[in-house]
């Protein structure tokens, strides 16, 4: 078992993320948002090349390896109506950086649904499948997080997404079901049951 955490949940700056990870005795980190000294805060796959090079060196010097990228690909800040070029650009920037750091996994999502939506549009399936294939073709494994996204609307929606995007795997956030409605049920939607969700998707979690 490898223990790690998402860096920016310990602090915005790279140095504080490294400090927290080392204090826990962990050897791995999942970088997401990051402020490298001298550069504005951005996602690890979006920071300038010079900032990325500096971050990689600092992580290596600290004895930390990058196990997974906490990306912004199709996350809850994006909608399926946004130009797909935004997503494709993020994927194309992430791939060489994953290879540089030796990371095999990348956390992705499936766009934020509208407040009253309870079905996943075909375009979401198409985009997630395309993104999944882009990573798999490079020997990298995308993992979908259950969050405020179409695939996270219920465990049934998650399994439907996996069926439509062969090769996609999951990362399970135990806290997210607590504040997300179960859109597989009639309105008014109850909150999701984290244990029930886990029981149905656990075989697909890496």
Regions found by a protein language model. Name each.
Residues 9, 33-35, 72-75, 110-114, ...:
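Active-site-proximal loop/turn and secondary-structure-junction residues that shape catalytic pockets
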Residues 78-84, 118-120, 153:
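Conserved glycine-rich "GG(E/T)P / GGGxP" loop and the immediately following alpha-helix
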Residues 16, 123-126, 153:
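Short, well-structured alpha-helical interface segments that form or flank functional binding sites
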Residues 69, 132-206:
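Acidic/histidine-rich catalytic cores of soluble enzymes
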